[in-house]
Amino acid sequence: GANHAILGITLTFSGKARQGIVHIENAVRLNPEPPYWYYFGIGMANYFLSDYDSAIENFEKVKEQNSTVVWPYWFLASVYGQLGQLENAKWELSELEILGETLTIEAGNNSTDIMDPTYSALYLDGLRKAGVPEK
């Protein structure tokens, strides 16, 4: 299961979200209790494929399983920024602050492994629309 998930996330980060999501979903099917990061991979792939509702659903699953991991908050802020749902984006950013984290574009760019320039631009654009400061 984990090998499928890792392959899927790697494919997603490298610009092949449509292929990646198939592997991650296979990993979920093979594991009766999939770890939170499987859902994070599915959420990212959905986001990069512009399936924002599914992305939100999967990022929320990550938060349900592990509320202290920062990535789903980052990506939810970006999704909500793309959707123009600024109140929801601000909520995610305030949740990050409760965790003792603040997000900047610079930090968001430096701490993800998104290798595909189109996907990276979408993610950072969403953060900017959400009102995340550059530094």
Language model: regions and residue ranges:
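Alpha-helical protein-protein interaction modules
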Residues: 1-135
